[in-house]
Amino acid sequence: MFLTQTQEWTRRGAALMAEMQAHFDHRGLRADAMGLVVFERGASGQAEGFAWRGDWPCYPCSLVKAFHLVHGLSMVERGQIAMHADLDRALRDMILWSSNTATNYVIDLVTGTTGDTLLSGQAFDEWRTARERLNGFFTDLGWAEFAGCNLSQKLMDDTRYGREAQYAGADGAYLNVLTPLSVARLMWELFEGDVPLSGPYLERARGELSRVSTHPEAKNSAYQLTEFLGGGLPDGTELWSKAGHNLWTGALESSYFKHDMLRWVRPDGRPIYVVLMTKGQALAETDPQVFPDIGQLLYARLNMAEPVEAL
C-alpha cells in the first residue's frame, strides 16, 4: 500500500468526516455511499494521509480517462502507436471536456480494437484479450491498489449494444470499477512518484489535468470545475483535476455517480490531494452545488497548519 495513515492523519480524517457529514448528509453525502482519500507528501517523502472506504469498488465514470491518458501517452513515447492529429485532439478532449467519443477513440488505438457489432467464438475471445490490455498495463506496474479494478469498458452515454454489451455482461457484472485508493495511487505516481512517462510526455499528462478558473470554458459544466470540488476553491488556486459524473444511463449499476480527483497547491506551496467518490441521485443530479461546497470546506480545513481536531 502506497499510503501511510499516521495517527495525526487518523485524527484529522475522523474530524473531517464528522464535519462533512454534519454539513452535507442532509444533502445526500452518505457515509455508506462514498469513499474519500486525502493525502500529501510526508516528511519521509512518502504519501501520508487518510482514507475512508478507500477500497470501495465503485463505478468510476470518467475517472478512467486519467488512466487512459497515461497509457496512451506511454505508448506514444515508446513508439507503439504514432501521434497524429486526431489522437492529439482526442487525448486533449477526453480530459478537457470529458469527451466519451474521444476516449473511445483512444481505447481503439491503444488496444487495436473497435466496438459495436456482435462477435462470437474465437473472434470475440481475441477481441476481449486485446481489450484487456487496458487492465494489463496497470497490473504490470505492480500497484496493489489496482487489484480487482477494471477500466477496459468503453464510455457510454446510455446502454450498451453488440460486443460492448457482451463484454460488460448481461447484468453489468464486468463494468468498469475503480476504488478511491486506486485513483489516489495514479495521482501520487503521476505527480510525486513514478509512471512510465518522461520528459514532454509526463508534462503533457500533468498539463492536461490542469484546471484554470479563467479558462474560456471554465463556466461550462463539461469543463468539470464549477460543479465539482474545484469550484469551491478560490479563484487563482493552482489545481489539477479529473471528475466523473453519470446521471441515468439506463442501467442501475452505472447511474447516479459523481466523483472528483483533485490536487491543489496550498498557500505555503505544499500540494494536497483529494479523491472523493460518491453514489446517489441527490449528489449526482438534484443538488449540483454540493461538490463545490464540499471543496470549499476541504480547502479551508486542509490548508490549516493545525490539525482539524484542534478547532
Where is each model-derived feature located?
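Active-site SXXK
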Residues: 59-81, 94, 274
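Glycine/charged-rich beta-loop-alpha catalytic/anionic-binding loops adjacent to active sites
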Residues: 45-56, 87, 165-168
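Short glycine/serine- and small hydrophobic-enriched flexible loop segments
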Residues: 70-78, 108, 185-192, 300
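A short, well-structured edge-of-sheet supersecondary motif
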Residues: 12-53, 264-265, 271-274
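Active-site-adjacent helix/loop patches that line small-molecule binding or acyl-intermediate pockets
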Residues: 3-24, 30-31, 86-182, 189
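Short, well-structured active-site flanking segments
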Residues: 74-93, 103, 197-201
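Structural recognition of the beta-strand scaffold that forms the well-ordered cores
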Residues: 35-38, 61, 93, 105, ...
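Structured C-terminal helix/loop/strand segments within mature extracytoplasmic catalytic/sensor domains
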Residues: 2-20, 175, 179, 184-311
